[in-house]
């Protein structure tokens, strides 16, 4: 028997990837597409490549008969929308940032709004599947992690958990394709602005910073403050992070490989690459995999960690479906058994 799901925000890039994945999921029926601006428009008119003959509607959510609702909506939307009564009717996976951070003051500092739903904020489960699998299985509200956050945390988590690095020395240099900025029209995302160009942005201000720090703090069992610098590169999709940290001990690469293997050997979507094989965005494009590898610089006594994901799949829609699979006791990789098409 298939579960019935709905999507609010299916017209965006992440929403479209959700539709694409769910149409090929054997245990899911897409029953509702919600929109306030495209009511009556058929989804195929918006995305002719997508075989979904369903029109956008704008119903009161309490009227819907769904097992699960995905929210691929702008920040602040779901924080005002969700309530306990709705969560008694259906499960929710929120792809926005509205329930990712536990400290309400972080929303005032980083997102510039006062969170209106602090009780639900505390009850939401952070949907990083490789770290919080058991909590996700029991959750009614899952906060899907950010794209930079997913790649950064997965790449560094074992080092923080084992406390083998100087936490104050950590620097994350991140690069993302243009789809990470969303589908809405912006001058800075026009072809002539981004083509043949790389630029840094939001220096010391990127909103994924507190998310990364919060969950690496849980791993380290102490408050973490780190440096995160994102860059926009002229490609459609993909994230590559390069992270640097000082080692506290004289460790060899095999020592660190043993640590990563201990944490990730049973995870279906994390690929610890062989020695000397460095992650590339094209190897994870349109897939739910996270590729990770590292090198130890014996001269500087630093570990250099590289991670790559597709920002729209493992960084958004694919991870949301992975969360759904856990919440409904499906195989974790159901509907996600695809790999990069080079």
UniProtKB/Swiss-Prot annotation:
Where does this protein reside within or beyond the cell? Cytoplasm
Q: Does the keyword Hydrolase apply?
A: no
**Record-annotated active site:** 147
Q: Which UniProt keywords apply?
A: Amino-acid biosynthesis, Arginine biosynthesis, Cytoplasm, NADP, Oxidoreductase
GO CC annotations, alphabetized: cytoplasm
Q: What class of enzyme is it?
A: oxidoreductase
Q: Name the SUPFAM superfamilies for this protein.
A: Glyceraldehyde-3-phosphate dehydrogenase-like, C-terminal domain, NAD(P)-binding Rossmann-fold domains
Kindly tell me the pathway this chain contributes to.
Amino-acid biosynthesis; L-arginine biosynthesis; N(2)-acetyl-L-ornithine from L-glutamate: step 3/4
Catalytic activity reported: N-acetyl-L-glutamate 5-semialdehyde + phosphate + NADP(+) = N-acetyl-L-glutamyl 5-phosphate + NADPH + H(+)
Domain of life of the organism encoding this protein: Bacteria
**Gene Ontology terms for molecular function:** N-acetyl-gamma-glutamyl-phosphate reductase activity; NAD binding; NADP+ binding
Q: Name one Pfam family in it.
A: Semialdhyde_dh
Please give the biological process terms from Gene Ontology that the record holds.
L-arginine biosynthetic process
Give the E.C. number(s). 1.2.1.38
Family to which this protein belongs: Belongs to the NAGSA dehydrogenase family. Type 1 subfamily.
Query: Function of this protein?
Result: Catalyzes the NADPH-dependent reduction of N-acetyl-5-glutamyl phosphate to yield N-acetyl-L-glutamate 5-semialdehyde.
Instruction: List the protein's name.
Output: N-acetyl-gamma-glutamyl-phosphate reductase
């Amino acid at each position: 028997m298939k579960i019935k799901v709905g999507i609010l925000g299916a017209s965006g890039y992440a929403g479209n990837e959700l539709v694409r994945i769910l149409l090929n999921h054997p245990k899911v029926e897409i029953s509702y597409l919600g929109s306030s601006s495209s009511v009556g428009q058929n989804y195929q008119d918006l995305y002719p490549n997508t075989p979904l003959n369903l029109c956008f509607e704008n119903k009161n959510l309490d009227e819907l008969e769904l097992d699960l609702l995905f929210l691929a909506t702008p920040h602040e939307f779901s924080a005002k929308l969700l309530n306990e009564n709705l969560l008694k009717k259906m499960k929710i996976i929120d792809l926005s940032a509205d329930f990712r951070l536990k400290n309400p003051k972080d929303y005032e500092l980083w997102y510039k709004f006062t969170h209106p739903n602090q009780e639900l904020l505390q009850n939401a489960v952070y949907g990083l599947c490789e770290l919080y699998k058991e909590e996700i299985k029991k959750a009614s509200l899952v906060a899907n992690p950010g794209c930079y956050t997913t790649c950064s945390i997965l790449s560094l988590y074992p080092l923080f958990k084992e406390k083998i690095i100087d936490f104050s020395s950590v620097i994350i240099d991140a690069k993302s394709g243009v789809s990470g900025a969303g589908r809405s029209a912006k001058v800075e995302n026009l072809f002539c602005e981004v083509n043949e160009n790389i630029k840094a942005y939001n220096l010391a201000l990127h909103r994924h910073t507190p998310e990364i720090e919060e969950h690496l703090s849980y791993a380290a069992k102490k408050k973490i403050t780190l440096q995160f610098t994102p860059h926009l590169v002229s490609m459609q999709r993909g994230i590559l992070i390069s992270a640097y940290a000082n080692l506290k001990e004289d460790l060899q690469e095999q020592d660190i490989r043993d640590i990563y293997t201990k944490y990730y050997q049973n995870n279906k979507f994390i690929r610890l690459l062989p020695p000397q094989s460095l992650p590339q965005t094209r190897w994870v494009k349109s897939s739910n995999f996270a590729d990770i590898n590292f090198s130890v610089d014996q001269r500087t006594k630093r570990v250099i960690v590289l991670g790559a994901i597709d920002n729209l799949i493992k960084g958004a829609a694919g991870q949301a479906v992975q969360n759904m699979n856990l919440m409904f006791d499906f195989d974790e990789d159901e509907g996600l058994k695809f790999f990069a098409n080079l």
